[in-house]
Amino acid sequence: LGKDATRFIMLSRSSDVELDFNFTKVKEKSKDNPLYYVQYCYARISSVFRNINLDIKDKVNIKNYSFEYSKDEINILRKISEWPRCIETSSSKLEPHRIPVYLFELASDFHSYWNMGREDVKKRFIDNDRISDDKIVFLKL
């Protein structure tokens, strides 16, 4: 078991809650392992950029775009907009568990949306080896 997994699991619980450390769950590659689930979200996003030969670190000028996001995408964008407040609250209340909980919730929302792309072509990130500009901006956020 790696130190990153141990830290993530320990940080994902409030200090006033008893820590239930399940070694089997932490080794799983599933939604039951919060660290894996968050890392898998990042891996999926990175794979989209690799497939279209873009660097995830490149800046995007959003002034030239008009966006038409679905309800599901807007919900994810709202969750992303909570990040600064999550950091601030976590710091001011000395509750670091808020950060891994937030990341897990965001990853869960993203994975749900990603899986919708199997049934709805409009929700796919890459279609015919192309990606729309609004999807690029969405993923960069």
Describe each model-derived feature in a short phrase.
Residues 1-141:
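Non-catalytic interaction-recognition regions
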